[in-house]
Swiss-Prot record:
Gene3D superfamilies: Dehydroquinase, class II. The lineage of its organism: Bacteria, Pseudomonadati, Pseudomonadota, Alphaproteobacteria, Hyphomicrobiales. The record marks 19 as: Transition state stabilizer. One of its GO terms (biological process) is amino acid biosynthetic process. Belongs to the type-II 3-dehydroquinase family. Pathway: Metabolic intermediate biosynthesis; chorismate biosynthesis; chorismate from D-erythrose 4-phosphate and phosphoenolpyruvate: step 3/7. InterPro entries: DHquinase_II (IPR001874), DHquinase_II_CS (IPR018509), DHquinase_II_sf (IPR036441). This is 3-dehydroquinate dehydratase. It comes from Afipia carboxidovorans (strain ATCC 49405 / DSM 1227 / KCTC 32145 / OM5) (Oligotropha carboxidovorans). It holds the Pfam family DHquinase_II. It is an enzyme of class 4 (lyase). Its EC number is 4.2.1.10. Keywords: Amino-acid biosynthesis, Aromatic amino acid biosynthesis, Lyase. It catalyses: 3-dehydroquinate = 3-dehydroshikimate + H2O. The active site is at residues 24, 102.
Length: 151
């Protein structure tokens, strides 16, 4: 049975490629999802990708990941990273190894973006690598759960 990881993208990430390309680049959400699926497959993992603009749906997807015994979670909470205690609590509650990802370097941006509730629940945070951060997150997650790349 193939292990799964959930890749969750929060509000406005459906606009990747068109929203503020000077900050977020020209890659689309479809590019992110393809990158995640390809990278996960190198480790014998299946990446289950979701994007939603609704906080409660993110919480529900985190619960679903636990119910389906996902091996890990990659999350870009978008703006909810800085505001959502509910998402933090969901991650803590399910105890799935989690990596937080941000396309931009949140620490080079507005001060309110320097605080992340998700980071406090994740074992790692990556920011500023563009969509490459998702690949790096999967590499780190695979190492954390003891998987090596398949040749």
């Amino acid at each position: 049975m193939t292990k799964t990881i959930y890749v969750l993208n929060g509000p406005n990430l459906n606009l990747l490629g068109t929203r503020e390309p000077d900050i977020y680049g020209h890659h689309t959400l479809a590019d992110v999802e393809a990158l995640c699926r390809e990278t996960a497959a190198r480790f014998g993992l299946e990446a289950v990708c979701h994007q939603t603009n609704r906080e409660g749906e993110i919480v529900d997807l985190i619960h679903e990941a636990a119910k389906k015994q996902a091996a890990g979670l990659i999350i870009n909470g978008g703006g909810y990273s800085h505001t959502s205690v509910a998402i933090h609590d969901a991650i803590v509650g399910v105890q799935i190894p989690t990596v937080e990802v941000h396309v931009s370097n949140v620490y080079a941006r507005e001060r309110f973006r320097h605080q992340s509730f998700i980071a406090k629940a994740a074992f790692a945070t990556l920011c500023g690598f563009g969509i490459e951060g998702y690949r790096l997150a999967i590499l780190g997650l695979a190492a954390r759960i003891g998987l090596a790349a398949k040749t």
